[in-house]
């Protein structure tokens, strides 16, 4: 294979690595936790990653405690957990 072909192959492999979504084995364990409303009653919208749905979804959060699978924004959830 010519050096140009090798360079093209290397570029394509690099692009594939960058564009490949996070796999479930690379996803943090807290993303597998269920949505947890917590014990408080300051109800507000939040997002959690749903392993069953394979996406971040909105839920009502009580405002305190809960667990680590709890994000203020959809973007934050997707950045941490979405595949």
Swiss-Prot record:
PANTHER family: KUNITZ-TYPE PROTEASE INHIBITOR-RELATED. Keywords: Disulfide bond, Protease inhibitor, Secreted, Serine protease inhibitor, Signal. GO terms for molecular function: serine-type endopeptidase inhibitor activity. Residues 1-24 form the signal peptide. InterPro entries: Kunitz_BPTI, Kunitz_BPTI_sf, Prtase_inh_Kunz-CS, TFPI/VKTCI-like. This is Kunitz-type serine protease inhibitor microlepidin-4. It comes from the Eukaryota. Residues 31-81 form the BPTI/Kunitz inhibitor domain. GO terms for cellular component: extracellular region. Belongs to the venom Kunitz-type family. Serine protease inhibitor. It comes from Oxyuranus microlepidotus (Inland taipan). CDD domains: Kunitz_textilinin-like. It is found in: Secreted. Disulfide bonds join 31-81, 40-64, 56-77.
């Amino acid at each position: 294979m010519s050096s140009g072909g090798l360079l093209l192959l290397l570029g394509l492999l690099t692009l594939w690595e960058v564009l490949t979504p996070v796999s479930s084995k690379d996803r943090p364990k807290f993303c597998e936790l269920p949505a947890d409303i917590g014990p408080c009653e300051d109800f507000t919208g939040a997002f959690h990653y749903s392993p069953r749905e394979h996406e971040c979804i909105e839920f009502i959060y009580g405002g305190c405690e809960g667990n680590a699978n709890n994000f203020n924004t959809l973007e934050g959830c997707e950045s941490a957990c979405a595949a």
